[in-house]
């Protein structure tokens, strides 16, 4: 068995990204039949891995601000993705509420010194 190697993981940025201020007013959106069925499938979180041949400083000062700006602008058209799901007591139905004070998505950026190709390989 191969010797275990300690690898470091460091959070380099955590922020909430919302649509540009004042661009989307408070909006309630009713759920469709399909939306209601999906409520019981569980919470979805996405994780993306990228190998970047640039220094961390370049990434945090150049690339990351552009990624956040792009995500913010995409929320102009897809603001329910930055909204909250509210489930009032019966007989009321669940709905999505976008509120400028609470509408955002959490973005966490992490770097690691682990071997990228080894981490992404299928070891099954």
Region spans (language model):
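Non-catalytic N-terminal regions of enzymes
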Residues: 1-124
């Amino acid at each position: 068995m191969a010797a275990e190697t300690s690898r470091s993981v460091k959070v380099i940025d955590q922020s909430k990204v919302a649509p540009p201020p004042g661009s989307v007013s408070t909006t309630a959106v009713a759920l469709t039949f399909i939306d209601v069925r999906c409520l019981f499938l569980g919470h979805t979180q996405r994780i993306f891995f990228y190998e970047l041949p640039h220094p961390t400083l370049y990434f945090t000062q150049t690339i990351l601000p552009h990624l956040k700006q792009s995500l913010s602008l995409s929320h102009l058209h897809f603001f329910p993705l930055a909204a909250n799901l509210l489930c009032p007591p019966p007989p009321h139905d669940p709905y999505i509420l976008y509120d400028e004070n609470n509408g955002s998505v959490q973005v966490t950026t992490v770097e690691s010194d682990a071997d990228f190709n080894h981490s992404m390989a299928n070891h099954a």
